[in-house]
Amino acid sequence: VLLLVLIAGAWFISRGTGVTKINIKEEDIVMNETVANNEALKGYRNIALFGVDARDKSLGKGNRSDTIIIASINEDTGDVKLCSVYRDTYLNLGNDSYNKCNAAYAKGGPEQAINMLNMNLDLNITDYVTVGFTGLREVIDAIGGVTIDVQENEIVHLNNYQISMVGKTDDGENYYATEGKDYIAVTS
């Protein structure tokens, strides 16, 4: 579902607002030496997906990444696996500087964030997609909203604020208003 949202969003944004393609020089990408010869990574394309806390249209250095997802695409079958990296995970950001992993994007933009993922997780990421809050709202609207399906037995554990969310659909504006908050007040 997330990959579908990102693909639809990238298409929508490219058609409606324009996409800025930023190339990172190959020599600026850091990978562990063992990664190049790792047979397990052959036939896969790994892409970093960043959701940044940018209320304006700036998507580069200076914005913390609220969401970090690695999309691993099997080039033979087309299967996609997504792995979320918790933003508060304490990792080496480079030069033996340890911090929450979302600080890598703030300190050095997508280049440092990709290098942080490659170094700590033994990956070969060279490509990325970044979406800010405005882009997120546009993506959600473009696909007709997002349905959040939380089961009754899960609600009690979600900040103890929710009453019911089963089948609730929000448009981009409402989702945008609640994204990044510590809790979401929901009514039936």
Predicted regions and their residues:
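Flexible, polar/acidic helix-loop-strand segments at domain edges
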Residues: E39, D141-S188
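Second-shell loop/turn segments in exported
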Residues: D56-L59, N99-K107, N120-D127
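Short helices/loops that flank or line small-molecule/ion binding pockets
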Residues: M116-M119, R137-I143
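Entry/capping segment at the start of metal-dependent catalytic domains
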Residues: V1-G78
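Conserved protein kinase catalytic core
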Residues: K57, V80, N92-L93, E138
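Solvent-exposed coil/turn segments that connect beta secondary-structure elements
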Residues: V52-R55, I73-D76, V85-Y90, A106, ...
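Flexible, solvent-exposed short loops/turns enriched in glycine
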Residues: K81-G108, G167
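Extracytoplasmic
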Residues: K42-R45, N63-I68, T77-V85, D96-Y98, ...
